[in-house]
Swiss-Prot record:
It is found in: Cytoplasm. Binds 2 Mg(2+) ions per subunit. Keywords: Cytoplasm, Isoprene biosynthesis, Lipid biosynthesis, Lipid metabolism, Magnesium, Metal-binding, Transferase. Dimethylallyl diphosphate binds at R106, K194, T195, Q234, K251, K260. Its main location: cytoplasm. SUPFAM superfamilies: Terpenoid synthases. It comes from Kluyveromyces lactis (strain ATCC 8585 / CBS 2359 / DSM 70799 / NBRC 1267 / NRRL Y-1140 / WM37). Mg(2+) 1 binds at D97, D101. GO terms for molecular function: (2E,6E)-farnesyl diphosphate synthase activity; dimethylallyltranstransferase activity; metal ion binding. It catalyses: isopentenyl diphosphate + dimethylallyl diphosphate = (2E)-geranyl diphosphate + diphosphate; isopentenyl diphosphate + (2E)-geranyl diphosphate = (2E,6E)-farnesyl diphosphate + diphosphate. This is Farnesyl pyrophosphate synthase. Its cofactor is Mg(2+). It comes from the Eukaryota. CDD domains: Trans_IPPS_HT.
Length: 349
């Protein structure tokens, strides 16, 4: 485990204790406090923690530190708490998403609602994971001049993510295939709202507020790169689900059988002949590996892989141009954005 990740994980137990103390202060019985603690520990720290860690990394960069190790203990704890607030937001979304999708496993363990005795209580547990964000922000940031900015940022990004989720759920229900509902424009809206805001913009905006870079022009400079970057990231994900090697991506792609409104199917629909369209209409979104292969054959006929590689190079080039024109006069740093782009450009997993 990387040192950065280990140091970040060390902060979490103290936050769980603070949340326990809040419940105890309300006179909550111990069994309920233990339930909440179990939910926090089961659902929050298990992932890659990329979003949370990038708050810390971005803050260090904006403040001019050579590495995270140069932060004082107090400074580190503060930005790590903001990072953990994103991880709590992610946990809240995932617990709810897994119920909506009737998923079985998440991060190599049973989904929370599938754990013995949890079931539908997971709905309330999801709400309580979201509530934890605001408990922690109040305790640690209430006296900061940017406190209201943090609250608005979390509220706005949460609602934007839910809007993306709504459009996704009504566009591509697993049990009712209707490809006429799909389009590249709709796909773009879904991925920007469902993924880009909370996975890319949120971490950088939080680090900016903590570092005192709060001019709306700088927040706009960040979002103007990070939102299209987040869209590019999700398009990569869609592409890899279909064309990535299972040994690279660590899973077998299921988007075709799951009727996902993915970039791949939308590009195919845009370019398909009448015959190819009929094949996709009859075979996409069916739990049948032969039908999946028929879709894949159409994707190959349409040279989706070539279209993707052209898209990737054009997008990366556009983003690099935007980054080159960043105005750093108020303390924002283009390097933050370069690091994000370099992490995902040409990724295989």
């Amino acid at each position: 485990m990387s040192d950065n990740r280990a140091q970040f994980l060390e902060v979490f137990p103290s936050l769980v204790q603070e949340l326990r103390d809040i419940l105890a202060g309300y006179g909550m019985p111990e069994e309920a406090i233990e339930w909440y603690e179990k939910s926090l520990n089961y659902n929050t720290p298990g992932g890659k923690l990329n979003r949370g860690l990038s708050v810390v990394d971005t803050y260090a960069l904006l403040k001019g530190y050579k590495s995270v190790s140069e932060l004082s203990a107090e400074e580190y704890k503060k930005v790590a708490i903001l990072g953990w607030c994103i991880e709590l937001l992610q946990a809240y979304f995932l617990v709810a998403d897994d119920m909506m999708d009737q998923s079985i496993t998440r991060r190599g363990q049973p989904c929370w609602y599938k754990v013995e005795n949890v079931g539908d209580i997971a709905i309330n547990d999801a709400f309580m994971l979201e509530g934890a964000i605001y408990c922690l922000l109040k305790k640690h940031f209430r006296t900061e001049p940017y406190y209201v900015d943090l609250l608005e940022l979390f509220h706005d990004v949460t609602f934007q993510t839910e809007l993306g989720q709504l459009l996704d759920l009504i566009t591509a229900p697993e049990d009712k295939v209707d490809l006429s509902k799909f389009s590249l424009e709709k796909h773009s809206f879904i991925v920007i709202f469902k993924t880009a805001y909370y996975s890319f913009y949120l971490a950088v905006a939080l680090a900016m507020f903590a570092a005192g870079i709060t001019d709306s022009k700088d927040l706009k400079q960040a979002s103007d790169v990070l939102i299209p970057l987040g869209e590019y990231f999700q398009i990569q994900d869609d592409f890899l689900d279909c064309f990535g090697k299972p040994e690279d991506i660590g899973k077998i792609g299921t988007d075709i059988q799951d009727n996902k409104c993915s970039w791949v199917i939308n590009v195919a629909l845009k370019n398909a002949t009448k015959e190819q369209r009929d094949i996709l209409d009859e075979n996409y979104g069916r739990k049948d590996s032969e039908k999946e292969q028929k879709c894949r054959a159409v994707f190959n006929e349409l040279n989706i892989q070539d279209i993707y590689h052209k898209y990737e190079e054009e997008t990366a080039s556009n983003l690099r141009e935007k980054i080159a024109n960043i105005d750093e006069s108020r303390g924002f740093k283009a390097e933050v954005l370069t690091l994000f782009l370099n992490k995902i450009y040409h990724r295989k997993k």
